[in-house]
Design a protein with these regions (language model features):
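Active-site segments that bind and position negatively charged phosphate/pyrophosphate groups
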Residues: 1-86
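C-terminal charged capping/lid subdomain of soluble metabolic enzymes
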Residues: 60, 64-147
Length: 147
């Protein structure tokens, strides 16, 4: 994971998948609740990329462009928001749940999600900027709903 640059969205995904109580994704034959890995990563990603944007502005802008965002005329400082907005657009277009609320979480789960995710130090420490426990909780709160 370190070589791939995985960081906050992956670290946060362990909590999202691990604390799931009642989400049953369409198309999955399962007798128990689960949040598939890709969904558990993407539901946090827009909030994370807004948070990490200042740490590596050029990379965020390049990623937004690579995902099809309109970047003409954008400043380098716009990369994180363009990337987040593009991800949200793609989530809507492909039927991905609307943030954490879309997979069964609410504000009452923020503490548990934060505790579980903040323990994933190898991924949290790989982020392009430091993140405190309070900032992690804010990221989960920002991930509750996007539209």
């Amino acid at each position: 994971f370190g070589n791939a640059g995985c960081h906050l969205p992956h670290g946060m995904s362990y909590a999202v998948a691990g604390l799931c109580k009642d989400y049953h994704p369409d198309g999955w034959s399962s007798d128990h609740a689960l949040v598939p890995h890709g969904i558990s990563v993407i539901v946090n990603s827009p909030a994370v990329f807004r948070f990490t944007a200042d740490a590596c502005q050029e990379r965020h802008l390049q990623a937004a462009w690579a995902m099809g965002a309109e970047t003409r005329g954008a400043g380098i400082q716009d990369g994180g928001h363009l990337l987040a907005d593009r991800l949200i657009y793609l989530m809507k277009e492909t039927g991905i749940p609307n943030g954490l609320e879309g997979v069964g979480y609410g504000s009452e789960h923020l503490e548990d999600l934060t505790e579980r995710a903040y323990a994933q130090k190898r991924l949290i420490d790989n982020a392009p900027c430091p993140v405190s426990r309070d900032q992690m909780k804010d990221l989960f709160e920002s991930s509750l709903s996007y539209w």
